[in-house]
């Protein structure tokens, strides 16, 4: 050993001996401080010195044990948190799976309901189309029957009345002036006296119905023709008045049917048939 090491070793030995003596020596009672005279309080507060806690004698503190217990406690808390986290995560996953299953079930139910509604709507549209077609067929059949009845009634009125209606329908679309109407009416009423082709015997036979007291003359024959034509016109007028009355009655019946149908028709506004029939 060198001189320096020996000197250090000799210095350490008295220090160790002094430390052992201090540990073995009983603690001396602290001297009681005598009460001092009151001093004036300082303007600034005095912070007392920090005194470390005294460790009781005879008890040794094992810091390793404290650290180990603290580590065990932290580990237990961490393990508890991990278990709670995984339980919460498992619960959330179960809820998510249940939510997905509920969504899929709801989606399938909604698709089934939509399919059912589509089928119902298709059936309803088919029924409406069938009902509409049936009504149209009934209306067409009814119109055909009415037309047949009208044609039968018109055919029973006479050939002259039918001819007059045909002429009226043909000339209804063309509007005539007053002069043209007068010329047309006079031409229809005034028939030309054609006797050029008749012989003497035919003229005698034509005038045979006259009374013997009255001589045969062209003016009398013309008056008789005009009288017959007036009778024919009166007959046609009577037939036309009867037909007009029948048409007014049919129009009133149709108007009442339309009004009755519009009252009970669903989803339609108020209808109105124009015109006024007396």
Curated annotation (Swiss-Prot):
Keywords: Disease variant, Muscle protein, Nemaline myopathy, Phosphoprotein
Primary role: Troponin T is the tropomyosin-binding subunit of troponin, the thin filament regulatory complex which confers calcium-sensitivity to striated muscle actomyosin ATPase activity.
Region described as Disordered: 1-63, 105-153
Keyword match Phosphoprotein: yes
Impact reported for residue 104 to V: In NEM5C; uncertain significance; does not affect levels of full-length protein in patient muscle; decreased interaction with TPM3 in the presence of calcium; no effect on interaction with TPM3 in the absence of calcium
Residue ranges with Acidic residues bias: 1-37
Superkingdom in the source lineage: Eukaryota
Keyword Phosphoprotein set for record: yes
Protein's name in the database: Troponin T, slow skeletal muscle
Subunit description: Interacts with TPM3.
Record: disease: Nemaline myopathy 5A, autosomal recessive, severe infantile: A form of nemaline myopathy. Nemaline myopathies are muscular disorders characterized by muscle weakness of varying severity and onset, and abnormal thread-like or rod-shaped structures in muscle fibers on histologic examination. NEM5A is a severe and progressive form characterized by symptom onset soon after birth or in early infancy. Affected infants display tremors with hypotonia and mild contractures of the shoulders and hips.
Chain intervals with Basic and acidic residues compositional bias: 105-149
Modified residues (Phosphoserine): 2
Cellular component GO terms, alphabetical: cytosol; troponin complex
Organism per entry: Homo sapiens
Gene Ontology biological process terms in this record: negative regulation of muscle contraction; skeletal muscle contraction; slow-twitch skeletal muscle fiber contraction; transition between fast and slow fiber
One Pfam family cited in the UniProt record for this chain: Troponin
Protein family per UniProt: Belongs to the troponin T family.
Gene name tied to this protein: TNNT1
Start-end of Pro residues biased regions: 43-55
